[in-house]
Amino acid sequence: MMLSFLQLNGSHHDVGVALGQFGAQALHHYAKTSPAWQHVMAFRDHSLVKHMQQQVQAQHPDYWAELQGLAQGLEMPLADVFTWNCRGDLWAWAPDGCTTIQKPGAPNRLAHNEDGDPLFAGYCAMVHIQTESDPGFTAFVYPGSLPGHTFGANAAGLCMTVNNLRTLHAQAGLPRMVVTRAMIGMPNLADALRYVQSVKPAGGFHVTLGQANQRHLVSVEFSHRQCSLIELNEASGHANHMIHAAMQHQPQIVTGSSGFRQIRLEQCLQAHADIEPLEILFDTKTAEFPVFRADPADPDQENTLASAHFEVGTDALQWQVHQGQCFEPVYWFKNDQLMTPDVKATNACNMATNP
């Protein structure tokens, strides 16, 4: 099923309501059938959740309004919806994964597999959001979740991809999904980097950032304890665990999939210097722990739900969204703008082969 495309305008509360209405049917079913939902809801009345709520209300009232609207549109209790949006802060085993390829050059290139709970397959969307306070942006969204913690780009030419980090011993702070929601709303790369270094998140993420007319891609790993930034000068990959030298001592879980994907990314980049990023993202050579993940019995309960490829040019971003191991995009974008709104995925797409 092709990803939906949503166009949302209005106040932050209005946007939240519309996102909730879009995801309501899927999330109601998910709440009844998902062990992950039940596990996260066990934290609903925890003091850590209450503190995180206070932090959002104090530091980001606009995003608190989005969460309130999201709960209204979902027709679910706000406490449940907020707790779900703190899932990765509260529980290291939340079903979020992802893989990113970073290739500095002319232009800089960035590609990403969005790995999430297969129960959400067919229920996600690309959404363009324009509020009164943020630059317009387009991002991949899950039912019941704030935008900004997946992949996307804004009107200022800032793009970002986000990978799960299974950090341990999270502490009170801003939910990591609120941190990345703020980052995709930043007017430029410098402001996004200043912001992520200044806040105190509860949990952790890896974020790769680039901006049109900026020389570098920047890799960011943050946890409650620390934030590390690296300007990338050579091709590299990230498979959702902390790999920065400054962060490797931090307590985390590295699953078999995460570890083997990291090894495979490095193998592909070393063996084929000119390899296309999507060729790596569509790789399945390691059968038990493939880079492209489509097994309903995936050991981390994650499947690749979409892929994105960004070219960070001198004056704009050009990027595409893909589904399946298909090189033919389903959507094309320039910065935050959809370029071909009637695009249909071809049935005769060029499928991936292992390098």
Predicted regions mapped to residue ranges:
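A contiguous strand-loop segment
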Residues: 5-7, 26, 37-41, 58-176, ...
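Short, low-complexity, polar/charged sequence segments that are solvent-exposed and flexible
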Residues: 128-132, 158-161, 179-182, 226-229, ...
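Catalytic Cys-His active-site segments of thiol-dependent hydrolases/isopeptidases
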Residues: 111-115, 220, 320
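Extended polysaccharide-engagement surfaces of secreted carbohydrate-active enzymes
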Residues: 221, 230
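Flexible, glycine/proline-enriched loop segments at strand-loop-helix junctions
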Residues: 53, 168-170, 176-184
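Short, surface-exposed beta-strand-loop junctions and turns on beta-sheet-rich folds
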Residues: 116-118, 166-168, 225-227, 324-327
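Hydrophobic, well-ordered secondary-structure segments
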Residues: 107, 176-180, 189, 193
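C-terminus-biased signal that marks the final domain/tail of proteins
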Residues: 1-96, 186-217, 224-225, 234-355
